Design a protein with these regions (language model features):
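Conserved short loop/turn motifs at secondary-structure junctions
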Residues: 155-167, 289-293, 402
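His/Asp/Glu-enriched short active-site or ligand-binding loop at hydrolase and phosphoryl-transfer sites
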Residues: 180-192, 317-322
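Hydrophobic faces of well-ordered beta-strands that scaffold small-molecule active sites
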Residues: 37-39, 119-122, 158, 182-185, ...
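CE4/NodB-like, metal-dependent polysaccharide N-deacetylase domain
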Residues: 138-162, 272-287
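Active-site and substrate-binding clefts of carbohydrate-active enzymes
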Residues: 1-94, 98, 195-446
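Short, solvent-exposed turn/loop segments enriched in Gly/Ser/Thr/Pro and often Arg
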Residues: 40-45, 123, 159-168, 322-325
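Glycine-rich phosphate-binding "P-loop"
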Residues: 121-144
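Acidic (Asp/Glu)-rich catalytic clusters
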Residues: 31-34, 106-120, 150, 278-279
Length: 446
């Protein structure tokens, strides 16, 4: 989730955040804590959940704006004789009201409700670290993210999610210097799909432990042919006039009960497959974006809850990576591991291909400008740099998912950065960038 709080509303902007809160973060509160999991809360998400006035606006959206859009579409469907679709939309609307009730019951403190589950952290604004131009730029992202976690959640074990699972061997020493002791990597191209090597941790010469994610199990959930593509599940891409979803993937009216039953079947299948995967030992790391569960895949939270139940029923032990490290001796990592991500093709092309070369160049130019300024760089310029380094802008542009919004956002932050570095004393750039990176760490040598 990039920093969208205060940067537009609909169709692109902070409504993305409100939607994720209602459909992913709040529903997951009923599942987190039921079994060991490794949860990384990205600092830039926490910045927004902590932003003054953010939860009040989210509640207004849930209580006023969303219900009105539901009402309009329900009336439209009924007028068209689509009573079954209208009934489904009314049922779905009640879930948003329930999310608002939960938020109000916790006093709007969603971050506080998530806090007990936050064990790992990540880079400050989810930058693709191998694409950063300088060691100082990497340290800025990593150390600011760690500082954010420590202030908000206290204890930190040294676990760190690499944004986009993007890893390059040259990062390992920098990560260790910042205090990172464990992270996840995508090594399918190095070991082969389904290889046993994905089930054991690796240790680098520089120090950090690398946990290979298991693409074979992840693909069951997160791929074009994975569980979410089943015909009975709710179609994410087809929607009503006000972007409500009432159809199944197979084109029929969505049947909530049938989809929930299928999610439980898929959970049983998933657990059985993972049990077979680790029958000779090892740790199967199934890493998922939180927003996949509930937002992109509507039934995902039901599936996850059923996975926990099935794991207990089928005898599949669950653990988090911090605990697992105490029971699994890491093997030496090859010094020639490839540069990898969990993006399309397993490489960096999503964020640096010709289609987004202008964005990659803009980010690199901005970083070098801030580094050259060193200690003279105002904090406003550094925060603008962090904002434009978010991996989401190039991802959205590559997939053509948000019109001109990604380029407009990057361009706006680049312009503000240059203005701040110019030293212009016109009051145009006073203060912070909303609540972005309140725990900014700028080394003296930056």
């Amino acid at each position: 989730m990039p920093y969208v709080e205060g940067f537009g509303t609909w169709p692109f902007g902070e409504e993305w955040l409100w939607e994720a809160i209602a459909t992913s973060y709040v529903p997951l509160l009923d599942v987190l804590g039921r079994a060991p999991m490794t949860v990384s809360l990205t600092p830039v998400l926490c910045d927004q959940l902590e932003a003054p006035g953010a939860m009040e606006r989210c509640l207004r959206w849930l209580r006023e704006i969303r219900p009105e859009s539901h009402r309009l579409d329900i009336e439209s469907l009924r007028s068209a004789g689509e009573d079954v679709l209208a009934a489904e939309l009314a049922r779905s609307a009640a879930e948003y009201a329930a999310a608002a009730d939960r938020l109000e019951a916790m006093g709007g403190d969603l971050l506080g409700a998530l806090a007990p589950h936050a064990s790992w952290t990540s880079a400050a604004t989810h930058a693709v670290l191998p694409l950063l131009a300088t060691d100082a730029g990497v340290a800025l992202q990593v150390e600011t993210g760690i500082a954010s976690h420590r202030r908000r959640f206290g204890h930190w074990s040294g676990g760190f999610w690499l944004p986009e699972c993007a890893h390059a061997p040259w990062l390992d020493g920098l990560l260790e210097d910042c205090g990172v002791h464990s992270t996840c990597v995508e090594l399918t191209d190095a070991f082969g799909l389904g290889a046993a090597e994905h089930l054991r941790p690796l240790v680098t010469d520089e120090g950090p432990v690398l946990w290979p994610i298991d693409r074979e199990s992840i693909a069951l959930v997160w791929s074009d042919g994975g569980y979410p593509a089943a015909g009975a599940y709710r179609d994410y891409h087809r929607h009503t006039d006000h972007r409500h979803r009432v159809w199944a993937n197979d084109g029929s009216a969505y049947d909530h009960a049938a989809a929930r039953a299928l999610a439980r079947e898929h959970a049983a299948d998933f657990v059985a497959r993972v049990r077979a995967r680790v029958r000779d030992g090892g740790v199967c790391v199934c890493a998922l974006d939180t927003e996949l569960l509930g937002h992109w895949w509507y039934e995902g939270v039901v599936w996850l809850e059923a996975v926990l139940d099935e794991s207990a029923a089928q005898g599949l032990p669950l653990t988090n990576l911090d605990e697992a490290l105490g029971h699994h001796e890491p093997a030496p990592a090859s010094p020639t591991l490839p540069e990898t991500t969990w993006g399309r093709g397993g490489d960096l092309s999503t964020w640096s291909a010709p289609a987004v070369a202008d964005l990659a160049w803009q980010a690199r130019t901005a970083e070098l400008a801030v580094i050259r300024a060193g200690g003279r760089a105002p904090e406003r310029a550094v925060r603008e740099l962090l904002a434009l380094q978010a991996s989401d802008w190039a991802f959205l542009a590559t997939r053509e998912l948000a019109g001109d919004y990604p380029r407009e956002r990057m361009g706006g932050h680049a312009h503000a950065l240059a203005h701040a570095l110019s030293g212009a004393d016109d009051g145009a750039l006073e203060g912070p960038v909303r609540n972005l990176a309140p725990d900014l760490i700028v080394r003296e040598w930056l």
